[in-house]
Every structure is written in structure tokens, then in C-alpha cells.
Regions:
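Hydrophobic alpha-helical connector segments
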Residues: 81, 92-122, 175-178
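Short secondary-structure transition hinges
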Residues: 117-164
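Hydrophobic alpha-helical bundle segments that form small-molecule/ligand-binding pockets
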Residues: 146-174, 178-181, 185, 189, ...
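Alpha-helical DNA-contacting segments of helix-turn-helix folds
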Residues: 77-86
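A secondary-structure capping/hinge motif
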Residues: 74-78, 129
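Short hydrophobic/aromatic patch on the recognition helix
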Residues: 62-72
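Basic, helix-initiating cap at the start of DNA-binding domains
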Residues: 1-47, 51-63, 77
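C-terminal peripheral helix-coil segments that are non-catalytic and often amphipathic
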Residues: 1-23, 154-158, 162, 191-227
């Protein structure tokens, strides 16, 4: 009987060690996955997706190419994972600012404008050109748009309630038409003629000004003027 207990105890110890080892392996893989994404996204932003090879990524991180492919089946899968993380981080930053710092919707718009300026400085034109030819990326962007609809409508209503957005505007039309126009701008490759900042300032910002009240315009000009 004592021998059985000893065998059971040894079995439990081995199982505990196995679980601990698996946890360490999983943690390492998770950290490596995040490192691959961070490294790849920096390169994608600067040089475009096609120019960056998977073996470049593996050499840059000093891991085997096989390991990279074990984690990400192909480059588009890697890009998609990176875009999902970027989108989640962007939403978290905006939400944190809105809850902790913003006094009204105009403050939030000013903050979003600042984030957009930062991104325009970090991301090259080639990146935008290439991602709009990738089916999985386009599907992800459409899904994000659909999920953000309700939040956007609540934001617009908050702006109306605060007196910064006009009451006579159909914001469903604004939301859908802006999506279609932005998609068409990318399709027509206007970013080759104008910078992304110019497109944002002369389309998105003009559209925002169109549904602001006089009070809203005053705060909008003040927020942007401080950047």
C-alpha cells in the first residue's frame, strides 16, 4: 500500500512538472509571437508588406524561419494578427482618454486627430496600397466597421446632447457615406497624389466641421490649433 502511495506521489510530481513546463513553453511562444508581430508591423508600415520577407523577420529576431511559420501560416496571417492588436490598442487608448481626460466629444475628436497625425507619420503609402488588395484584411476592416456602428451612433448622439453636433443631421448617412468615400479614395489610389494627412484634413475633418454647431466648431478649431 505504501508503495502505491509513493508511485501516486511520484506520478503527481511528474504531472505537475509537465504542466509547469508546458506553461513555460506557452508563455515563451506567446512572448515570441508578440515580438514577431511588433517587428513585422514596424517593417510593414515603413516598407510595405510585399517588400518584407519572412526570412528577414526570422533573421531580425534570430529565430528560425520554421518557427515563424509554425506561429503564422503566411504573411497575411501575420499582418492580420498585427492589425487586430493595433486596432485593439487604438480603441483602448481612445476609451481611456474619453473616460479619464475628455470633458466632451470635441476633446475626443481632438485626441483622435492627434493619433491620426502620429499614424500618418509612421505608416508609408505602400502599406495602405497593399492591404486593400488582401481579401482577409478587407474582411477584417468590414467587420470592424460593422462592430463600431453602434458606438459611433452613441457618440454622435452624445455630441448632439452636449450641443456640439447639429440636431438636423442624419448621422447614419454620414457614417455610411464616409466609409464608402474612404474606400473609394483608397481604390482610386489618391494617396499617391496626396498625403494621408491631406486626405484626412480635406475630407474627414471637413465632414466633421459640417455637422458641428458653432460651439462645436469653436472647440474643434481650438483643439486642432493646439497640435
Amino acid at each position: 500500500m505504501r508503495f502505491c502511495y509513493m508511485e501516486l506521489a511520484e506520478s503527481d510530481i511528474r504531472q505537475t512538472i509537465k504542466i509547469r513546463d508546458m506553461a513555460e513553453i506557452n508563455q515563451y511562444r506567446k512572448e515570441l509571437r508578440n515580438k514577431i508581430i511588433a517587428y513585422a508591423m514596424r517593417e510593414f508600415h515603413q516598407r510595405g508588406v510585399k517588400a518584407v520577407k519572412m526570412d528577414e523577420i526570422s533573421r531580425g529576431l534570430r529565430v528560425s524561419k520554421r518557427t515563424v511559420y509554425e506561429i503564422f501560416g503566411d504573411k497575411e496571417e501575420l499582418l492580420l494578427a498585427g492589425m487586430k492588436i493595433e486596432r485593439a490598442e487604438y480603441k483602448a487608448r481612445v476609451e481611456e482618454y474619453a473616460l479619464a481626460h475628455a470633458r466632451n466629444v470635441m476633446d475626443v475628436i481632438g485626441y483622435i486627430y492627434r493619433l491620426q497625425m502620429e499614424r500618418n507619420q509612421q505608416v508609408g503609402v505602400v502599406f495602405y496600397e497593399e492591404i486593400h488588395r488582401m481579401p482577409r484584411i478587407l474582411e477584417f476592416l468590414k467587420e470592424e466597421h460593422d462592430k463600431e456602428y453602434d458606438d459611433s451612433m452613441r457618440f454622435f448622439q452624445a455630441g448632439v446632447d452636449e450641443g456640439y453636433f447639429r440636431k438636423d443631421v442624419n448621422f447614419e448617412v454620414v457614417y455610411e457615406s464616409s466609409r464608402i468615400c474612404m474606400s473609394e479614395m483608397m481604390h482610386q489610389q489618391l494617396y499617391k497624389t496626396f498625403t494621408m494627412q491631406e486626405l484626412f484634413d480635406n475630407f474627414t475633418l471637413i465632414m466633421i466641421r459640417g455637422f458641428c454647431t458653432d460651439r462645436g466648431l469653436e472647440l474643434l478649431d481650438k483643439a486642432i490649433g493646439q497640435l
